[in-house]
Amino acid sequence: MNKYTFIFEVGWRDPQTGRLKPYEYRKKTQMSINDARAYARRLANTQNVLHVRFYKEMY
């Protein structure tokens, strides 16, 4: 299975004010596409997460 580098964009909501926090970016290497989808689902199920986007890094 092919391994890639993915960049995840996470949109958070501040629990106290309800306002959107600045996006957080996480870079993960050596992940398959299925692993990236599972990681994005796990992040999306975290409390106060509004959305998760992920991009495959191109060289």
For the regions a protein language model found, what residue spans apply to each?
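Short N-terminal "domain-start" leader segments
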Residues: 1-13, 53-54
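Short, mixed-charge low-complexity intrinsically disordered segments
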Residues: 41-59
